[in-house]
């Protein structure tokens, strides 16, 4: 892990490594720019890392900002072997300068800075490459979460919760699934048919036409057993967030209202009220409704933008929780059980 430099150290280090000339055309004529390969606003420390910098002339700096000059090409020209990414981004996922994920087809997903006005202006030449699909963000662990691995990220700064109303919901052991009006996918944007997804596909056929254009529903598909065998689920699909056409997560109150309108259910609520660390910690439990409990998720009750996700959503995972995605995808599907259904479904 590289230590962040000061701005001056970054500039002088990048220029010295690159011989004080543009790594693309070899021009030494001023002005030269110490270009951030990945936008510095995406980094918690400002992104002033030597392996996140490149010396570019004015023309190639503009091309890099517009992303017509690709990050991988810049790294190659600089002799950078390791791909350095902000900690909240998934290793191995190619992204452009602005953090937008790049698919194998060359199409791009909308990242957290996609709708930033400055990014929109400079990316004008490539906007036709973007789909309306959005990958669900990586959720950081709370500092006291014991179920994290060495590759997981931890939210050390909890200041965004201070003085705010929060909602703590049960973390369900299923498959993170996103529903659009005309499409659905799990964490991977490419939909892959699987026996465990037949039920959610039928549900999507019913509710998809009622999802507003540009919106998406995110929830847990608990149809198939993963690590926990459920016997008392309120429903197989449980909503935990709804996003509007401006890539804003609806407030929890609006999420519950929309969930009820669509005839769905939210994940169970464990606590709702002002931020109180003791109250949040008290949400840890071994059982919930007769089933084992994987952990819990904390979020602001108010609406927030996609780019704020890593500051306002965090999780606690029980100790020793085993992820079995590869196993359950390749083995026989074991269907979870439902609790007796009330006549009029509520949304928790």
PLM features per residue range, with description:
Residues 16-17, 59, 261:
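Residues at alpha-helix termini
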Residues 49-52, 58-130:
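A detector for short metal-coordination/catalytic motifs
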Residues 1-21, 42-51:
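Short, charged surface segments at domain edges that flank catalytic/cofactor-binding sites
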Residues 23-55, 64-75:
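Histidine-centered nuclease catalytic patch
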Residues 130-348:
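Core nucleotide-handling region used for phosphoryl-transfer chemistry
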Residues 19, 28-31, 181-183, 213:
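Short glycine/proline-enriched coil/turn segments at helix->beta-strand junctions
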Residues 13-16, 23-26, 47, 228-232, ...:
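Short, conserved, surface-exposed binding loops centered on an aromatic residue
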Residues 9, 29, 163:
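Short coil/loop residues immediately preceding or within conserved phosphate-binding loops
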């Amino acid at each position: 892990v590289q230590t962040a430099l000061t701005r001056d150290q970054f500039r002088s280090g990048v220029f010295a490594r690159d011989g004080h000339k543009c790594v693309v055309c070899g021009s030494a004529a001023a002005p030269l720019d110490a270009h951030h390969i990945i936008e510095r606003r995406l980094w918690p420390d400002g992104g002033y890392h030597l392996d996140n910098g490149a010396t570019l002339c004015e023309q190639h700096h503009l091309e890099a900002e517009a992303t017509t000059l690709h990050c991988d090409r810049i790294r190659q020209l600089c002799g950078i072997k390791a791909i350095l990414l902000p900690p909240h981004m998934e290793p191995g996922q190619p992204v452009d300068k602005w953090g937008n994920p790049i698919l194998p087809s060359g199409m791009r997903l909308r990242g957290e800075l996609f709708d930033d006005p400055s990014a929109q202006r400079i990316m004008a030449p490539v906007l036709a490459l973007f789909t309306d699909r959005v990958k669900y963000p990586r959720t950081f662990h709370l500092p006291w979460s014991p179920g994290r691995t060495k590759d997981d990220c931890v939210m050390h700064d909890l200041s965004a919760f201070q003085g705010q109303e929060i909602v703590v919901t049960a973390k369900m052991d299923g498959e993170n699934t996103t529903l659009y009006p005309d499409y659905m996918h799990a964490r991977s944007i490419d939909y892959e048919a699987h026996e465990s997804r037949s039920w959610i596909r039928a549900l999507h056929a019913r509710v998809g036409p009622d999802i507003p254009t540009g919106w998406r529903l995110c929830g847990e598909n608990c149809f198939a057993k993963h690590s926990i065998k459920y016997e008392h689920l309120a429903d197989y699909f449980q909503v935990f967030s709804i996003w509007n056409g401006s890539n804003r997560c609806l407030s929890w109150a609006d999420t519950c209202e929309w969930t009820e309108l669509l005839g769905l259910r939210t994940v169970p609520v464990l606590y709702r009220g002002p931020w109180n660390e003791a109250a949040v910690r008290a949400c840890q439990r071994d059982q919930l409704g007769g089933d084992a409990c994987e952990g819990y998720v904390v979020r602001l009750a108010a609406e927030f933008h996609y780019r704020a996700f890593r500051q306002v959503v965090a999780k606690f995972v029980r100790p020793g929780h085993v992820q079995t995605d590869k196993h359950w995808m390749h083995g026989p599907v074991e269907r979870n059980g439902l609790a007796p259904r009330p006549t009029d479904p509520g949304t928790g």
